[in-house]
């Protein structure tokens, strides 16, 4: 089995490296990692407008590039190498993946074009204890007519204080363990959401707290 990059994947990797060498100097990284937002908005705009990395995993019929995880890894390796502070991980690795795996056709049609246009996304999963297993989901939901009511607190949400779109993991009231878990997606401007920056040791990956 051949694990080497293809010529196209090598080109993607090398193009990413050249872009990041030019735009992610140590000085720039230190400047923006100390801010509450945690990244340079102008850099994110250049990533979206010039590189179109936000479209990497999005199928072509939604306006994306329709590439795969090997191409994603090629870019992530370079982002890690140059400590690129950006909402790419939360938006693409988490948000887009959640939509592709679990989203309805209507949700994909609504939210994928927004992410392609530069809006940011993330997943809120961990409860106050910070675990990533199913038992750590502390937010509950119940159905009220045609709507759902969610209550709970999420901690250590990547870009949770700044993302435009939230994918929320919640458990139905009364359910235990892996039972009754659903994902909800909504704009962060939805009423009833309180968000705040949660400073952590690794300032290159901003975390937030989300309260419903």
Predicted regions span which residues?
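Flexible, small-/acidic-enriched active-site or ligand-binding loops
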Residues: 136-139, 156-157, 187-212
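Structural signature of FAD isoalloxazine-binding scaffolds in flavoprotein oxidoreductases
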Residues: 66-75, 133-137, 186-187
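Long, well-ordered alpha-helical segments
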Residues: 16-26, 103-107, 145-151, 182-193, ...
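A short, Trp-centered hydrophobic/proline-enriched beta-strand micro-motif
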Residues: 117-127
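Amphipathic, small/basic residue-rich leader segments at the start of a protein or domain
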Residues: 1-89, 110, 114
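N-terminal glycine-rich flavin-associated loop
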Residues: 86-106
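Cytochrome P450 C-terminal beta-domain/meander region
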Residues: 133-151
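A short core secondary-structure module
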Residues: 151-196
């Amino acid at each position: 089995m051949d694990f080497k990059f293809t010529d196209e994947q090598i080109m993607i990797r090398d193009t990413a490296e050249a872009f990041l060498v030019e735009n992610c100097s140590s000085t720039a990284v230190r400047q923006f990692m100390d801010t509450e937002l945690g990244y340079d908005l102008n850099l994110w705009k250049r990533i979206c407008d010039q590189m179109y990395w936000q479209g990497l995993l999005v199928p072509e019929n939604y306006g994306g590039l329709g590439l795969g995880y090997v191409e994603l890894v090629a870019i992530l390796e370079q982002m890690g190498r140059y400590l690129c502070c950006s909402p790419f991980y939360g938006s693409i690795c988490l948000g887009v993946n959640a939509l592709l795996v679990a989203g309805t056709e209507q949700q994909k049609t609504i939210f994928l074009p927004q992410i392609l246009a530069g809006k940011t996304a993330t997943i809120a999963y961990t409860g106050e204890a910070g675990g990533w297993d199913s038992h750590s989901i502390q937010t509950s939901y119940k159905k009220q007519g045609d709507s759902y009511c969610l209550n709970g607190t999420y901690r250590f949400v990547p870009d949770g204080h700044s993302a435009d779109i939230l994918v929320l993991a919640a458990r139905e009231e009364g359910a235990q363990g892996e039972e009754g878990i659903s994902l909800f997606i909504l704009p962060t401007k939805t009423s009833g959401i309180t968000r705040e920056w949660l400073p952590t040791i690794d300032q290159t990956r901003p975390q937030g707290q989300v309260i419903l």
